[in-house]
């Protein structure tokens, strides 16, 4: 039964059938596709390079090309597509599970209510959403759901405090009750939305909570896969036993096999997620495990303890951001490097998956394997923002598009909402991030259409300025920008008129040892060119450190800044993210814009000035921080000054705010 209005009107019936008719026409016209070879055998185009990737540190270009080719071969897979009907009864994960009509898998995926769900889908299609702000557990919940014409509310899910509250497959419940029967604060906050198939943006991920979040994501993904697989196997048995004249309509599948997509920043983060999955499924056999260890695991520690905890958590191990990995599950084994169309879970970095999809220019485009994704997990989204976010957007734009080829699909078994081109309204998207940003908010707005609703979970911010390791005079100056598009020009004009004169006036000894922190690379280029070419600042010597500076270049800039040869140092947020330089000699910090990551404010505005005090380069409490902001910096500003202050700073008539 299709999830559309059950009107008897012929015109509406024809309209509702149109997606299925179009799909079948397209598949008939398309030639059968041969077995695919999943290999990245084309060099990345310049546009596909991560915007913030640091330049190679050493080695000539030929050596780098060889290394890149070798790295690409790590994930190469040569394997034919399997017959989706070739699943044996002995592959059942659990033989004695009883059907529970209250199970979220049933109510959301397998057997959605034909009376209540279609109006929600229609409201989501029309962009009619209602948002409510409610306290939930230990955080704030911004809850949105499709608003139907009858105005019926969609309440928040019931609390979940332990494994016993979950509808888990028997074998998973047994493992979890032994490992962790009760939940902590983070798990109690996340679990109700995760296991009830709500879209979720969780904005309080920390190093300390990361393992709990991974474990929950792994458990939910496996539970979804096991239930999907067992339903198919049991229905196969029913069809095999059915009489020839018995009309059984058993719709239990999508177009292609992959059901879960996990977007992760590095190979090491992939290793951590895989380990969480293995700790729950506990397979007897692991096919291609040695190959996985060789290509993904680095056991030697690369960083000393003086690097911040979040930096070591992200970049320790194999920090390559170019990978994609298919994983296939059977009752007793897992297989690494399975062909995408034979995989249950796809692990990938945004860049790796973008390259696997291909490009129109090369006429090698394939994203059919994303057509039936029902669960997307985006972990460490704040780290992905420091890569090329356009790759993430590209991937979401290609999710749940009806396939160009059949791939051996039995259309009599495909769920109705797939045939009706409604899959994106049933897909669950879960994003874990250390903080919220406009990019993440837009991702939730533009690509999360779940009929069951979506939530943003975010704690109130006390403000990073309270935790600086040194006393400093901090001045926040607000400038006006009429629109978001006009913000860059307004910011630059304010900088040249209000900030630059402080560096150029004749007795401006304070200009020495000034670090200018610039989050955006485009803004960095603009300011760099201004210092290089404008006669107003010709007397101000300056150096630069961006994400593209190699190690020797950055070392020279730091040295010249420390000795005073360069009065000003321009420093980008991505350079700090990827390197976490300990820059010495800073007496004044000017923030062209606030960092997205509030930890960076503490490290730069506090940590750099603290080092200068300890080396007696600046007197105690005499360090200066000057911050430029507009109303469009609301999210960043809240994390720095705190939730209780941000409203006044954005709305009050005064435009200067001092903190000590």
Swiss-Prot record:
Role played: DEAD-box RNA helicase-like protein required for pre-18S rRNA processing, specifically at sites A0, A1, and A2.
GO molecular function: rRNA binding; U3 snoRNA binding
Record carries keyword Membrane: no
SUPFAM superfamilies: P-loop containing nucleoside triphosphate hydrolases
Annotated region described as Disordered, given as residue ranges: 1-133
Subcellular location: Nucleus, Nucleolus
Keyword Amino-acid biosynthesis appears in the UniProt entry: no
Gene: UTP25
GO biological process annotation, one example: maturation of SSU-rRNA from tricistronic rRNA transcript (SSU-rRNA, 5.8S rRNA, LSU-rRNA)
Organism domain of life: Eukaryota
Family membership: Belongs to the UTP25 family.
UniProt name for this protein: U3 small nucleolar RNA-associated protein 25
Feature: compositional bias, Acidic residues: 1-14, 58-104
Binding partners and assembly: Component of the ribosomal small subunit (SSU) processome composed of at least 40 protein subunits and snoRNA U3.
Record's keyword terms, sorted: Nucleus, Ribonucleoprotein, Ribosome biogenesis, rRNA processing
Entries under InterPro entries matching the protein: P-loop_NTPase (IPR027417), UTP25 (IPR010678), UTP25_C (IPR053939), UTP25_NTPase-like (IPR053940)
Source species: Podospora anserina (strain S / ATCC MYA-4624 / DSM 980 / FGSC 10383) (Pleurage anserina)
One GO cellular component term: small-subunit processome
